[in-house]
């Protein structure tokens, strides 16, 4: 991340994508090329990706749809943890089984229609479970990624108290 010159509070995020799927004939046929790629970030390990298997991709690596849902889930997590820390809610465990629904059009395009986050949060014994639940709404309102999409991102949190 870098600050955007001349724009207060603006940040640039850079990724370099390299396609590794030329099997010798480029994209001369739909079935004749691989879908693997690498995403490179300065100072970080490469991320290997491919298309979803339904689009002839490799099921053993990440696809853009997986990463898209994960970006919404992880942004919510980080927003939520910050709010909890500031509100003196001690989170001791957090898991999310997020699911995104993408619908394809007859012309081959498509879009995500919804993503549902299902965070299971454990707070320290004696913590305010109602407040912990309410902070999910605020986390959603402050999540940069959720604020950038044009479809509903629902949140169905479960709050438990630790021992």
Sequence positions of predicted segments:
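Extended beta-strand/beta-hairpin segments
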Residues: 1-70, 81-163
């Amino acid at each position: 991340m870098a600050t955007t010159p001349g724009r207060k509070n603006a940040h640039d995020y850079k990724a370099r994508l390299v396609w590794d799927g030329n099997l010798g004939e480029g994209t001369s046929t739909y079935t004749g090329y691989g879908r693997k790629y690498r995403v490179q970030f300065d100072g970080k390990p490469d991320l290997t990706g491919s298309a979803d298997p339904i689009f002839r991709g490799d099921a053993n690596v990440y696809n853009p749809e997986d990463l898209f849902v994960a970006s919404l889930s992880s942004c919510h997590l980080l927003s939520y943890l910050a709010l909890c820390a500031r509100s003196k809610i001690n989170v001791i465990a957090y898991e999310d089984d997020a699911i995104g629904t993408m619908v394809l059009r007859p012309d081959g395009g498509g879009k995500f229609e919804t993503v549902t986050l299902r965070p299971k949060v454990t707070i320290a014994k004696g913590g305010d479970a109602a407040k912990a639940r309410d902070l999910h709404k605020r986390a959603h309102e402050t999540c940069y990624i959720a604020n950038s999409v044009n479809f509903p991102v629902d949140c169905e949190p479960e709050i438990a108290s630790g021992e």
